[in-house]
Amino acid sequence: MLRMSTLLLRTLRDDPADAEVASHRLLVRAGYVRRVAAGIYSWLPLGYRTYRNIEKIIREDMDNAGFQEVHFPSMLPREPYESTNRWTEYGPDLFRLKDRKGNDYLLGPTHEEMFTLMVKGEFSSYKDLPLSIYQIQTKFRDEPRPRSGIIRGREFVMKDSYSFDIDDAGLEASYQRHREAYIKTFNRLGLKFNIVSAMSGAMGGSKSEEFLAPCPTGEDTYVLCEKCGFAANVEAMVTKVAPYTGEVPPAFEIFDSPNTPTIDSLVELVNAKFGQEITGADTLKNVLLMADGKAISVLVPGDREVDLKRVGANLAGVQELRLFEDEDFAKYPGLVKGYVGPQDAAKLGITVYADPRIVIGSHWITGANERDKHARYVTHGRDFTVEAFVEAAEVKAGDPCPTCETPVVIDRAIEIGHIFQLGRKYAQALGLTVLDQNGKAQVVTMGSYGIGVSRAVAAIAEQTHDEIGLNWPREIAPAEVHVVAAGKDDSIFSFAANLAEQLEASGLTVLLDDRKDASPGVKFKDAELIGIPYIVIVGKSLAEGNIEFRVRSAGSKVEFAADNAVSEILAAINN
């Protein structure tokens, strides 16, 4: 039993100054976590019990699915990550260190290489497969902007598992087993979630899906078609456009366009100057970026913004992507800021990419590469070409579903799980083969499956909290019942302690507020803040033979006869 008189717990009345989201604010105020440094947190007893309950559920579901648990170190040698090129690919996100002999190590962001090498060292035959193994381990990523408390930290805990199969059919079966186990786990955790198509990113591989917990302050944006059920992270949203079927435009012409710093001002000038009725969608934005130190231009319609996350996810191999800065323009004197067009990109040393909406044959109003001048009838395929099409424009609510063309809705969420079909990338790089039935060496195909264990604590808090505090589901709460001794009489404290012991003997986990130096009002506020699902108040009504029972999630309260309190409480909880 937890007793608040001796518990390492100090609740706070004020929000932490750096709290941006409800979970961060409430987990700190309720004494669940404490900040050590940017993106690094310590777990206090209530927080760690909650975390361990989540870990327990995940472990049970992994074990029940037939997956075997292992454990790797957090500090890993450089060499395996060089073999897969991830020592370079991870860039500044990787924590790197040297030992006293000058050997390079890293703090593991993920453990694909270690899992692959373990299986390589132990197994050599197709008879050893399929195999699925997992670990629950601390990960490290040097996030440029750690934020939102434990949602995006530099140190965090993940469950990562990997499947090993002889062929693609086996990989698909292993992938589906993990997918089903995840659905079961997230349902047990009481999370609302959507499964959406996603990009594989630095992990590599082909098929990829994310498990997203809807949350207004979530960092991930996804699209959902309420008609056909299509769902995808915005990075994976595919733009479907029809080919251009209009007339061939006349040769492009340059016109004066002073004082047009915005798309709206350009549209207003063109409509007045040429008697046209165009909109921002008829103009072409040329967004200049530096991609791994090389200048590129991304073309999108003028009524759309460029989504850098979409560009980065869809430009293969690019590690660092940023907008042009003044010093970049200085290196390319042929680029006139605010008047850039794609017509002379090759001469200027710029590689051009286009959003799929910039179809071949379409014509646009865009910069003329001269100060205070634009051009119209600039036509894709005639006046400029592009290196490739890339999903670049922001996705908007109402865009057509790529499956059924119904307008999609957009929501925000927290990523709580991600599953990948990695294929043979890591096995090939690290030489993981087994002999098949014919004695021929075959490269093993792999799947990767992750759950953010520490992040799940925050995701559940985000979805279940209310205006007065945390509100945990029973299976993950640090205790199931919070017994509050609300008064000064010894009889109240004696009855509360006895009741708590009986409830615990009945199989419930109990938090007893037996503090004698805290007022009933303070205890009630702490109970609401801490968020235990069932609250029992032993107070002044005890003199009349009653105690009060509250359901935190419903905000309901009822009185029970003190003599029958244990049976009444058990019946109410298990009803």
Model-derived regions: residue spans:
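NTP/phosphate- and nucleic-acid-binding module
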Residues: 1-575
